[in-house]
């Protein structure tokens, strides 16, 4: 199977946002991002046709590391149906408060049973986060995500990469911001976040050559923040 080598590029604000995507949906969005020219002008993507991306079952199969394209296409059709209703949330600090911006990922989707491919059309509102990028951006190869089994792991990689200096980095994040950024269930208590989100993700990352540790910080008796220290392979 041919290796994936296309790059996913997005502004840091998007990498650190709340995506509200399942793993199958994330694979489709990330694959579509590799087909966007991150250096192109926003005007180049004003036209709906330019924002419409085709993804075939072979591409999805490589990212998910599935055994066959039949399973890949099944997952793609199911995810495409859900994607039309998904929004990302970006928090931005103003002079007096913190505002939340909600943006739909896609405005339309199309697939034909048995065709082996789907089409998605990114919304115009999301394009400023995907193109005309000169600085403050997150970049990684799609092949780095091939076979990832948890959306938490994928989102942690994006978050840490957005704060990396070269291959290394250190960043402190509040428990609540970490919860929303990694799509962790609201019902999870702090102990659950550590045991069911962070530890499995670290295990998966270490198998991929990452060196990563985290420290817990308390406010009073409660763990309120986490500090991650990492080195990418």
Regions found by a protein language model. Give the residues of each.
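Charged, alpha-helix-forming regions
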Residues: 1-233
């Amino acid at each position: 199977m041919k290796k994936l080598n296309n790059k996913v590029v997005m502004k840091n604000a998007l990498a650190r946002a709340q995506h509200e995507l399942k793993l199958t949906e994330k694979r489709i969005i990330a694959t579509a991002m590799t087909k966007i020219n991150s250096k192109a002008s926003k005007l180049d993507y004003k036209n709906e046709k330019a924002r419409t991306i085709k993804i075939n079952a072979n591409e999805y199969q490589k990212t998910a590391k599935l055994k066959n394209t039949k399973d890949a296409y099944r997952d793609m059709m199911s995810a495409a149906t859900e994607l039309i209703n998904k929004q990302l949330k970006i928090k931005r600090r103003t002079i007096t408060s913190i505002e939340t911006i909600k943006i739909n990922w896609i405005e339309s989707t199309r697939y034909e049973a048995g065709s082996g491919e789907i089409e998605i059309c990114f919304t115009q509102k999301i394009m400023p986060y995907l193109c005309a990028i000169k600085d403050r951006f997150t970049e990684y190869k799609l092949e780095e995500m091939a076979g990832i089994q948890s959306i938490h792991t994928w989102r942690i990689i994006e978050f840490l990469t957005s704060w990396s200096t070269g291959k290394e980095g250190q960043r402190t994040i509040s428990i609540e911001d970490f919860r929303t950024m990694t799509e962790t269930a609201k019902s999870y208590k702090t102990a659950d976040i550590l045991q069911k989100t962070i530890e499995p993700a670290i295990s998966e990352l270490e198998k991929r050559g990452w060196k990563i540790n985290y420290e817990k910080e308390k406010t009073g008796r409660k763990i309120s923040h986490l500090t991650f220290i990492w080195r990418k392979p």
